[in-house]
Amino acid sequence: MMCAGMLAMPCAASVWAQPQPVASGQPDRQQEAIRQTRAFDISAQPMMQAVLAFARQAGVDLYVGDVDLSSYTSVATQGTYSLIAGLKHLLGNCPIGYRISEGNGRLSFQLVDTGPGGRSQVYSLKPVVVQGNTVNERVYQAPRAVSIVTREEMDRVPVRHAAELIQDTPGVASAVNRQNPGLSINIRGMQDFGRVNMMIDGMRQDFVQNGHMQRNGEMYVDSELLSEAVVERGVVRGVHGTGAMAGSVDFRTLDFGDVLREGRDIGLKLRGTSGMGYQGNGVNFIGSAAGAARAGENLEVMAAVSRRSIGDYRIGARGGIEGQNSVWFNGGKIEFNDVKFAAQEQDSGLFKARWKLSDDQSLLFSYVGTRVGYSYTTDADTSAQESGTPWRKMGTSKAQSNSFALDYKIKPADNPLLDLKVKAYGVETNVENYTTPTYPFSRFDGEFTDAAKIRENIDNEYWDSGACEKPDKTPYALDVCRQYGVGRNNRLSTKTQGFQLDNTSRFVFGATTLSANYGVEYFTDHTTSNQRWDHDGREVRPIGTTGKDALNPQGRRSMGSIFTELKLEDDFFTISASLRYERYRLKGKTQVPGKQTVHLSRLDKFAKEMCAYGAFPGLAPNENPRSQVQSVYGPGCRLALAGDESAIAAWWADVPTYVDQRGRTKNFYIPGGRRSSDYEKEFQPEDLDDQNALYDYDVSRSAGMLLPALSGAIRPTNWLEVYGSWGKSWRPPAINEMLMVGNHPRDGFASIYPNPNAEPETSRTWEVGANTIFQDVALDGDSLSLKAGYFDTRADNYLFSSMDVILPGSNLERLPLPGTTAFVNNRNRTKFRGLEFEGRYEAGWIYGGASYTHYLGGPNKFCEDLYFLGAGENKFDRPNADGSYPVEHQKALARGYESWRAWADDQVVCDNFVFNSAIAKPVDKGTLLVGVRLLERKLDTGVRFNYSGEGWYNRDSGGSQVWFKYTTWDWYASYQANDNVKLMASVENITNRMYVDGYSDAMARTFAPGRSVALGMEVRF
């Protein structure tokens, strides 16, 4: 054996059984240690650090006493073991034994020196090395901002929406819309377009569909198939850090150890939860079935399926803000008490097969997929819709996501330089949004308002006759055909292929370890979209449509990174330095704004004038004087739609009249006065110069960046760790930000333009924090674990959607009114600062937890280039007829610019017409949980208190308060009837509080469920 301070002697793996007597008075502790299994991933390293890792991953208390571990190196331990088998494997043939004891009802291991001269008696249970009562102990001994959501925590209250999985995590929120199953995650105020790397088993979920900019990035995940969720906030240094400015969230699926019990080759787990009748409040059924088998020593397979059925639900009846649940109806306000169109049907599947190639390496194939159907709805309106609520159902939606991966791992026990992980994966997410046919409130000429007659008229005149598919229709007829009488199916797809490779090499120098983690990551996202139309089940193609959905553009973006991190640590300190180089490339097609000359034919001008009055919606004859005008203009509009110019000329020459409400006959009113009864003279063809137009444009952009990071931690006592970090990160523009183009659906209120000049975002983040673990706080053997931190992220060129951009050639010197939209870079620094806290208390029969997030500072300010694509050609730099220049040009010269265009290109203007989540400061939030374990720990019950602060959406520009302060209470319980059966019950929102989830989708404003009661059962074999 080498002496302490030199390289430690490895303890080879061995089947040699050490004598391990159980402590007196604890005959059942050994059986409990045999039954409990854990998934371990512990490399060969100094024994002291190895047993620390064992305690953390096993979730047990471990005591060293006087045992000297400095001369030993552990055996690498990976895979699923019982607690006893795992510790035996870790210790190998070292002369170290253990005793099992119980402190305050908790399972504990105490190490014993069984070597020559060693004392085999049980030493005093001091000092404590580590106490690991749950897997979350990994949180409180990690010198960084990391949180873990365990399966136990997921099971306390049924998960209706995936956003509930991370709602208790500090620094994390979700722009949840409870009518839409898509999950969007916000970390420290940042979200969308990959700022948060959202993953399932390390596979990126990069799907994006555009809407009202509340969720530009969604994933679909089923909580029934998960074992835990790992949340890292801030700069991510390892293999999952590419392009992630805010952090990462990895939802990890069930593993073999979650289904197979120790010593069993076959395992089955069945779960089911349902709402309790009327009190279930929309929880119809949530359940799953998982089975696993071990074939010999080298092959394991597992399969699982799940189903989730959620319905509409009632909102709370107490609290809330006066009028919060009311909408306008017939000049007054009415209240609504439920959320319509929240029903969702989700089916998911999971499959894994692991082949153990040798003791050191394995190959894993995995698949996880989900399919969910739900309603395609509008955002909340201030007026009552047909449902009696703010929401209107537009149609149906279907989402399907499939993820495949192949993982290879090798970690030789005798080679500390090799700890290699390789992953190749593919993810495909498809969403279909089907919009059912709609019809106007009145016939275009105001002739009638009966809904059935309107539908019959449009179907017969435009669709059944095939008129909407003929190329010679007027512009107005084209608008009719695009909007009414036809169903539209938007199909969106994102395909992601990725490759990850990282290795960790370790060098042991006595009690100090130097590790190097290095590797590469590459992934590519390919987005496609199309539209299909149908009328009464027949596929049609309205004239003027292409089948493309430019608001969800087609393109490809690839990103790659190479990284390394060096870490030096011992029992007192940890210091690390990392460096990564990342590069991206984006290619796609879009349309950029420009100018053109537009030719208006005689028929075009006639149709424009006639139909502007004859198609005034919502009015019928004799309802008001305007309808009398419509009764004359209507025939003119119909003639324009028919396109018969000879009939138009005859009708125009007839000088139509109408009778007003007083019975007086009046001549046909023409804006500006009737000038000629000759159709050809009155409506002259015209060429309009300098008209806005869109031109096809191929985008190909690429860039790279070097990103350093530093961190350090010290542990001055056995209960305190203080850490700090600083690092740079970036995020290149996404496909939608560069390529999206089109008009707001239906009403055309806004025009959206691409920004192929968008610059990458860059940020600097620094944070400080502390971990503490106190023992014997209130009871013998209890522990109190706390993590607190401060973060400060400052981002440059943060991309946001501006609603008032100026197009090239507009000749404007200030921003227009909202309506012209594009993604632009914020020329003001965007700041995100706050405090995070979480803690746990564990005393065996009683336990608790808490978390809190407080955001500092006010809402961010947003400034943009006056011309985001450049000012372009303009009239101010053109000389007048006398050779002089306009005043604007002269002012630019006086300011030191060579032209007005140069001045305009250099201007930055500040405004807050921002249309996405960045305009809103996240709300403060917190949770407090207290639980007890009774009846020999078979009964586990507790209460959870939830708090959310208030928040505004675009407060500086007159935006309204969307999120109001609230508190709620939940109760949960589980009873382990025997080794195979566990019963579960919960009551969510006990006080039936009315509230909108804090920092949820500001446009959807879907209320959270009121009081909900659920019962469940889990059966394992």
Residue ranges of predicted features:
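Extracytoplasmic beta-strand/coil segments of soluble accessory domains associated
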Residues: 110, 163, 167-204, 233
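Short acidic/polar hinge/loop motifs at secondary-structure boundaries
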Residues: 205-235
